[in-house]
């Protein structure tokens, strides 16, 4: 793995789920929604610099270590590490049924 900042690319469905979560939280509190959104964005930016900082994704079948995941504010973010980018594959609430992939 090269020691440089990788670009972040969101899968369309993952990004839509992130936006939906923001809108859902915003119904109750704009301030809370902004805080959660900001902290998630910061966490995602950090993996561009330190992609191996989170454990391998336990829901990825035959994971070679390139698929990783972490939880923040009750949301689970799964991503794939490639040579040039981090692909955000999934964004879901932790109470939703996990899917193997």
Please state what every model-predicted region is.
Residues 1-39:
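Arg/Lys-rich, positively charged N-terminal/basic patches that mediate binding to nucleic acids
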Residues 1, 72-76, 80-101:
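Enriched for short, Lys/Arg-rich terminal
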Residues 22, 51, 92:
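Short, flexible helix/strand-to-coil boundary loops that buttress conserved ligand/catalytic motifs
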Residues 39-42, 68:
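Hydrophobic alpha-helical segments of small multi-pass membrane proteins
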């Amino acid at each position: 793995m090269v020691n440089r900042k990788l670009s972040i690319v969101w899968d369309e469905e993952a990004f839509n789920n992130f936006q939906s979560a923001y809108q859902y939280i915003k119904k109750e509190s704009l301030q809370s929604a902004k805080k959660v959104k900001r902290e998630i964005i910061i966490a995602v930016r950090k993996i561009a610099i330190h992609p191996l900082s989170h454990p391998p994704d336990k829901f990825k079948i035959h994971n070679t270590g390139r698929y990783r995941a972490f939880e923040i504010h009750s949301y689970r973010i799964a991503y794939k590490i490639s040579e040039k980018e981090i692909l955000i594959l999934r964004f879901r609430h932790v109470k939703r049924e996990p899917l193997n992939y």
